[in-house]
Amino acid sequence: MSKGRLFTSESVTEGHPDKICDAISDSVLDSLLAQDPRSRVAVETLVTTGQVHVVGEVTTSAKEAFADITNTVRHRILEVGYDSSDKGFDGTTCGVNIGIGAQSPDIAQGVDTAHETRVEGAGDPLDLQGAGDQGLMFGYAIKDTPELMPLPIALAHRLARRLTEVRKNGVLDYLRPDGKTQVTVQYDGVTPVRLDTVVLSTQHAEGIDLEGTLTPDIREKVVNTVLSDLNHDSMDTSDFRLLVNPTGKFVLGGPMGDAGLTGRKIIVDTYGGWARHGGGAFSGKDPSKVDRSAAYAMRWVAKNVVAAGLADRVEVQVAYAIGKAAPVGLFVETFGTETVDPAKIEKAITEVFDLRPGAIVRDLDLLRPIYAPTAAYGHFGRTDIDLPWERTDKADALKTAV
């Protein structure tokens, strides 16, 4: 990485149209898992002016929750803050269309009875559950922040959460739910040295003065508050460019301003572009889908490797074949920051972590309604909620294994 490089990451608030869709999909998932932890769920949502469309495939015994999906959708929209057409959407009056079928039996056979059991005669119960699809998933951790996340995305998420907080608690009661944040950081090598630019766009009520009210309020109540809590050793935050609503007024927002879809913010959901991404979205998918559960497991692996002091930053990749339990590949990259032989790190990972889908679900206790809170502000590095894949409970075992 060259000296003086600028790297940028973005986040969005829970009122962004795509994030409304993620929230609805995960709220439906949680409602079904709460009644039937073995529910198979793949739910996609689309929102546009005055309408919500929820489609996908579900196999579940949670009949009450399934029958109540429309109310689940409305409740989540209202919880986000869209309760009036003046804000661009109203969860009470919008149209809600449900088009959900059953999971394909061709897929189910490979998940319910993995290749290892069907063909190879394996007797281990954890060989019974196969991967719900082929695919590759990445996990990453770095010593940039206490939560071991890249600094640009961590800061962008904190700004987005604070933007929502001042709206909901009435500190800036003229704000509306839709909003985006973007952070550009200057690096010396891989060390963040200076905050260069913060871009913040937020929906607001009609008649708010951009220069006289919105910009100073955002600087004082959002940006300065977040930076005062950041306390980063190497990054200078004393002189940065702040751009608030660079287009001018932002009154028309939410689904009235832009249509939204589940799964369109996968870089926001992960590492802000700093690490690679396998391409699979998370929201609306139960943990039999390795797009979600294995990406969580890879973050768990990466964070524990760094927490164990085996490397200052690490990226791990896992890959699966549909219907097979065992991964078909594992790749570990330590970028020259390792403190022991990388081959020993990879071997330790395979000894300490069982990466079969059934084991991931067991070890991270994923058959629970824990997903709706992850739908906005990132799935990784969260400091506001307790997520099992963020724990560093395997660090000592990794140290012993190497």
UniProtKB/Swiss-Prot annotation:
One of its GO terms (molecular function) is ATP binding. Its EC number is 2.5.1.6. K(+) binds at E44. Binds 2 divalent ions per subunit. Binds 1 potassium ion per subunit. GO terms for cellular component: cytoplasm. It is found in: Cytoplasm. It comes from the Bacteria. Signal peptide: none annotated. It is an enzyme of class 2 (transferase). Its cofactor is Mg(2+); K(+). GO terms for biological process: one-carbon metabolic process; S-adenosylmethionine biosynthetic process. ATP binds at H16, D178, G179, K180, K249, F250, D258, R264, K265, A281, K285. Residues 103-113 are annotated as: Flexible loop. Homotetramer; dimer of dimers. Belongs to the AdoMet synthase family. This is S-adenosylmethionine synthase.
